[in-house]
């Protein structure tokens, strides 16, 4: 719902699935709480599936595999209300085995750009922030979050489909280190700059 989206974006927090369903998505239906709890995850999954019409970007599997081959550890940080949506997508794309950590706001209660969600990923990987490069497609969540978490490198991937969401942040002062148009550009960049010792 727009109301929950506004709450989540302003607070940078994610509520538990049961609370999202009860207080926002199905609030007007006055259903028994125990029934809502029982189906909350499924409802959140369907909500995310409808809201996030996922299509795999070109070169994604090849890039993930090549980064793995050259010793780059990988993970994902996602703002999502379902606990099962992202793992299912990663499996569908055949890249789940390469992800050493999958950090979701649904599991942490924290949303990007809150730097704490980035710090959770760093702790799971046992790495320092300066050892990590981050690739994301928004200023509002990814660039700001990576900068606030003081990650070593921030690469923004151009995404025309969501550019309109970032208009309010263009003058925020937060900039990526570089822009790319697709995953096929990523491995050459990492090879070229990895004198910086990026591990992730």
Name each model feature, range by range.
Residues 1-58, 65-69, 83, 178:
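N-terminal helical cap/lid subdomain that shapes the substrate entry/recognition surface
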Residues 61, 65-68, 77, 81-83, ...:
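Asp-based, Mg2+/Mn2+-dependent phosphohydrolase catalytic module
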């Amino acid at each position: 719902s727009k109301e929950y989206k506004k709450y989540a974006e302003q607070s940078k927090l994610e509520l538990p699935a049961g609370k999202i369903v009860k207080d926002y998505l199905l609030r007007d239906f006055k259903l028994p709480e125990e029934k809502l709890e029982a189906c909350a995850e499924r409802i959140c999954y369907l909500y995310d599936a409808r809201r996030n019409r996922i299509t795999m970007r070109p070169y994604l599997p090849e890039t993930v595999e090549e980064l793995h081959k050259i010793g780059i550890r990988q993970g994902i940080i996602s703002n999502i209300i379902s606990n099962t949506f992202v793992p299912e997508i990663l499996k569908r794309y055949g890249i789940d085995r390469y992800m050493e950590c999958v950090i979701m706001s649904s599991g942490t209660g924290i949303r990007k750009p809150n730097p704490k969600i980035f710090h959770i990923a760093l702790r799971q990987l046992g790495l320092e922030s300066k050892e990590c490069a981050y690739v994301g497609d928004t200023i509002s969540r990814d660039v700001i979050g990576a900068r606030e978490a003081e990650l070593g490198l921030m690469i923004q991937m151009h995404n025309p489909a969501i550019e309109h969401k970032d208009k309010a942040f263009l003058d925020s002062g937060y900039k990526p280190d570089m822009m790319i148009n697709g995953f096929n550009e990523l491995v050459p960049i990492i090879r070229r700059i990895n004198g910086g010792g990026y591990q992730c």
